[in-house]
């Protein structure tokens, strides 16, 4: 994914996030009570994307390329915020400004999918 490269994310990490967030469904919407909806393939919130410079509408954010672009920015921001700690960055991506950055089921799921992708890539290149 170009967005991963542009944001210096490890190859396959953002795809693993999207797999857990929406099962790679670009039309996924998860409604939250009073906290904005999570939208699209990466399940990013509209206000989060706006805070990263997004100027479009919620409908525009449903475009997979746009959704991935802003999700990559947000994930990279969270990982950088926690000094390169991928697990803490994943927890913060999922929970917002996370207060408790201990291991979570969410980050464990993403890491497991990510590890499977890495193993599959290694098997393919051998």
For each feature predicted by the language model, list its residue ranges.
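Catalytic glycan-binding domains that act on GlcNAc-containing polysaccharides
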Residues: 1-126
């Amino acid at each position: 994914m170009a967005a991963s490269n542009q944001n210096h994310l490890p190859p396959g990490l953002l795809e693993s996030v999207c797999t857990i967030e929406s099962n790679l469904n670009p039309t996924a919407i998860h409604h939250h009570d009073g906290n904005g909806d999570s939208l699209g393939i990466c399940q990013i919130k509209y206000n989060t994307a706006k805070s990263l410079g997004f100027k479009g509408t919620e409908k525009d954010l449903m475009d997979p390329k746009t959704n991935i672009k802003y999700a990559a920015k947000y994930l990279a921001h969270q990982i950088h915020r926690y000094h390169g700690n991928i697990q803490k960055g994943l927890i913060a991506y999922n929970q917002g400004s996370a207060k408790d950055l201990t291991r979570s089921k969410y980050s464990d799921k993403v890491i497991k999918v990510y590890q499977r992708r890495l193993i599959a890539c290694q098997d393919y290149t051998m």
